[in-house]
A protein has these predicted regions:
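Beta->alpha turn/N-cap motifs
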Residues: 44, 71-72, 82, 87-96, ...
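Bacterial signal peptide processing site
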Residues: 22-24
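C-terminal motif of bacterial Sec signal peptides marking the signal peptidase cleavage site
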Residues: 16-20
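A conserved helix-loop-strand patch within extracytoplasmic ligand-binding domains
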Residues: 110-159, 263
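Periplasmic-binding protein-like
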Residues: 111-121, 145-154, 213-255, 257-279
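Short helix-initiation/N-cap motifs at beta->coil->alpha
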Residues: 67-77, 166-195
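Short, well-ordered beta-strand elements
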Residues: 31-44, 62-68, 136-137
């Protein structure tokens, strides 16, 4: 009888010990999950920049995972559906337009990281002033991009926009003077624009720097006009669901992406086609 009781006591102790180990492991797994962040990003330059940030975040005990996207719609859908923790591909005016169209999206800007000056390309003409009467300008199907594009044309004296207008909110409908009677075709998906340019379609094609880089174009040398990077409101940002901007992983991500190491990488790698920002 004593032997049976002794065996039972040992067995009970073993069960409790295993249970305790199980509890400890579970807590460790939970802690590890809290130290991971999954970020959705465009291939170039966003995912490349994030790859450089991986070891720096690892030093802070954070595992960065990257999921790449090829368009400008799915990254926000994935964020809303909690498939990713953050995304890195869009600028503030674009985010504002997305939130206006999707009031159920509760997103915030967690921090600006870099600027990609947009370029206007042409195989037929050397400047915007050389564009012919009744010419066609092909651009991306994003209303939030129209203001920045039209501002370049206005700066070159090709068109005029309404006075007193917030240029980031300007659209094709705000053109008040267009002496060349240019047609602005804003119906094209952004990823197709480099191919349209290479096919010599239209008189000018507006291409975002990320798509240009992905297609092997030089966003500084190849365009006939380039947007200025100074006082540029189109900084690409880390976007998260509201409330997550205060999470340790998100704060660390923004801090690392704004670090000297990453800023130096951006400057050296993209040579002005992508410009780092620090605030």
């Amino acid at each position: 009888m004593k032997k049976w009781i002794s065996t039972l006591a040992v067995s009970s102790a073993l069960v409790l010990s295993l249970a305790a180990c199980g509890t400890t492991n579970s807590g460790s797994d939970s802690s590890e999950k809290e130290k991971k962040i999954l970020v959705g990003a465009s291939n170039i330059p966003h995912a490349e920049i994030l790859e450089q940030a991986k070891p720096l975040l690892k030093e802070k005990g954070i595992d960065l995972e990257i999921k790449t996207f090829q368009d400008y719609i799915i990254p926000n859908t994935a964020l809303a559906d909690k498939e990713i923790d953050a995304n890195y591909f869009q600028h503030v005016p674009y985010l504002k337009s997305v939130l206006k169209e999707n009031p159920d999206y509760d997103f915030v800007n967690a921090g600006a990281i870099h600027i990609e000056p947009i370029g206007i390309y042409s195989k037929k003409y050397d400047s915007l002033k050389d564009l012919p009467k009744n010419g066609t300008v092909i651009m991306r199907n994003a209303v939030a991009e129209q203001g920045r594009i039209l501002s370049i044309f206005e700066k070159e004296g090709v068109i005029k926009l309404k006075k007193g207008l917030n240029k980031t909110e300007a659209t094709i409908n705000d053109i008040v003077e267009n002496p060349k009677n240019l047609t602005f075709n804003a119906d094209i998906e952004g990823g197709l624009l480099p191919q349209i340019y290479n096919n010599n379609e239209g008189d000018a094609v507006v291409i975002n720097a990320n798509y240009a880089l992905d297609a092997g174009l030089d966003p500084l040398k190849d365009p006939i006009a380039v947007e200025s990077g100074e006082d540029n409101p189109y900084a690409n940002i880390i976007t998260v669901r509201k409330g997550d901007e205060n999470k340790e992983t998100v704060k660390a991500l923004v801090e690392v992406l704004r670090s000297k190491e990453i800023q130096d990488f951006i400057t050296k790698k993209y040579k002005g086609a992508v410009i780092p920002v620090s605030k």
